[in-house]
Amino acid sequence: MSPPKPFPILRLPFLAIEEVFKAMDPIEIINFSMISKRTKEIGKRMSFYSNYAIELYVHEMPEIRLHGTKDVVSSFYVMTSDKEMDGKIEEKEWGRYIIRKVFKYDPIDEWKQWFKYVMEIFRKQAIDVLTMTLTTFVDQNVSIIDFLKSNVKSVDRCSLYQRDEQINVDKHTAYLLDNVKINSELCYDAYINNDDFNPKIPKSLQELRIYNSKWIEYERLLEIDCKSVILKNNPISNKEWNVFVKKWRVMETNQNVEYLELD
């Protein structure tokens, strides 16, 4: 029995090509786009990419997660000191999820290059999720933030964490909040080491959650203007709280706030 003939996808009308692309998972689309300049240009022309979501994670290993129309693809970049493993790829399927591991000497650099290509193919300027543990790649935090500043117009939901209390990430936190635009949600779960910590807090968020908010005193609270505000471990006194509530009720301050929780 002779092998099947290659399917001439590029000879199809564009609408038919687009239907073929809709049946592909995001990795298949990216792999197709890498074949030639022509396939790359065709890959960038699809009209349904607005339904795709792109998420970035920097925890134990950097990750790019792509939510397609049917499948969710996660690409992990795993640091390796084994020369034989450098560049190797492992893929596993689990239901709707496709897990892709890429072994690299410099996972952050590879993660950046792969992300730029993903953004180009799917014609994205903003990303849906950024989740970052600031104590994982401390020496590269500034480089990562500068990269995001140059390549991402905005982030819809951002979560920042600190796993090692002994590592001071105050400056990195402030630098990220000064340079990355956050549209909808900010979750901040880190320890504060400096009394003068005073980062920019985005305005008009749908939700602001700060789990160690000792640095947010009364005057700073008056500046917060988000729809839902949750502040844990907060030092505001009962007297200040009562004054704030009175101002809030008569709409003298924080007019966008609909829900406020202090602990």
Model-derived regions, located:
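Non-core capping and flanking segments associated with repeat-based/extracellular domains
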Residues: 1-263
